[in-house]
Amino acid sequence: MSVQTGVPGAGEVRLAEGLRVGFLHVPMSQEAAKLMLGLPKGSLEEATLQLFARAGFPVAKSSRSYRPSFDDPALDGRFIRAQEVARYVEHGFFDCGLTGQDWVQENNADVVQVCELVYSRASAQKSRWVLCVPEASPVKTAQDLAGKRVATELVETTRRWFKAQGVECEVEFSWGATEVKVPELADAIVDITETGSSIKANKLRIVAQLMETTTVLVANKAAWANPAKRAKIEQIVLMLQGALAAQHMVGLKFNLPKAKLEKVAAALPALRNPTVSPLSNPEWIAVETIIDARQAREFIPTLKAAGAEGIVEYPINKLVY
């Protein structure tokens, strides 16, 4: 979007078609009437709904419906398994969608990877696809699995990985509950883990890591080339990234004797680039900053001991850098 201002008749406002800024609105063409989103059904579903709500795009969905509703008239979408999203984005059924990097790679999907969104079902970190065997297995390396059977949902990626290791083995598709297939139904498995707890619970041992993966937003190439759709995708990305950046942050504001600011800043390295404002008492200042929420319990007592008053901690919904 570019905005030019000036005297009436000398300036103009240009908006990507279909966007609204303040009271200005340019209707979308029929071609770009709705941005069709592919949302992940299954393990990522609840985390995705929460993220969209924090980003300002609440998604309403009944328990039996795969057709979500949005309060933004420019959006439409469907819930579908994350394994399939990239394929449908490539083929143009969805303009964009959220899926895992692993499934983009598995499907060899020809899509635009717009951004990473580092969140998952249970944590705010990347997941890993790992090669596992039973704790008592004699297997120590991938080479020890030559001629053996490996079960996984990520078949093509696993086959390519073993080929790169120079190992010939049988890779078979698993419909789920992959951890229980060793040792009776398979010699090893390739499975995804966030924390490693399920691997330990099933008495498995990691032999190697195939890849790291996280959620990504991908776009159809034609949709990305459409100015109106691209602008809407970029708006969604900005807000999603802002919500993710803010999830472990809080705002902190307090009043402080001006003479103590340098000392307080030195004692609290994370208190960098704070906003400092004058107060009616020239000897005092108001300080406002953003910190990691997990540091607040250490910061606030330190600030109080340094003479700070009126300390307020408040939640942050979005943080846009």
Language model regions located:
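Acidic, glycine- and histidine-enriched catalytic cores of nucleic acid- and nucleotide-handling enzymes
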Residues: 133
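Short, structured active-site "lid" loops
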Residues: 76-93
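Residue-identity detector for glycine
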Residues: 6-11, 18, 22
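Small-molecule-sensing regulatory modules
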Residues: 16-75, 79, 99-115, 119-128, ...
